[in-house]
Amino acid sequence: SAKDVKFGDSARSMMIAGVNVIAD
């Protein structure tokens, strides 16, 4: 569903943000 896609995008964005924080 569209909700699932939005949730997936949010989770991916949070994961990427976490990786960026660790990289810093």
From Swiss-Prot:
It catalyses: ATP + H2O + a folded polypeptide = ADP + phosphate + an unfolded polypeptide. Its main location: cytoplasm. It is found in: Cytoplasm. Induction: By heat shock and ethanol. The keyword Isomerase applies. Keywords: ATP-binding, Chaperone, Cytoplasm, Isomerase, Nucleotide-binding, Stress response. It comes from the Bacteria. Its EC number is 5.6.1.7. One of its GO terms (cellular component) is cytoplasm. One of its GO terms (molecular function) is ATP binding. Forms a cylinder of 14 subunits composed of two heptameric rings stacked back-to-back. Interacts with the co-chaperonin GroES. Belongs to the chaperonin (HSP60) family. Together with its co-chaperonin GroES, plays an essential role in assisting protein folding. The GroEL-GroES system forms a nano-cage that allows encapsulation of the non-native substrate proteins and provides a physical environment optimized to promote and accelerate protein folding. This is Chaperonin GroEL.
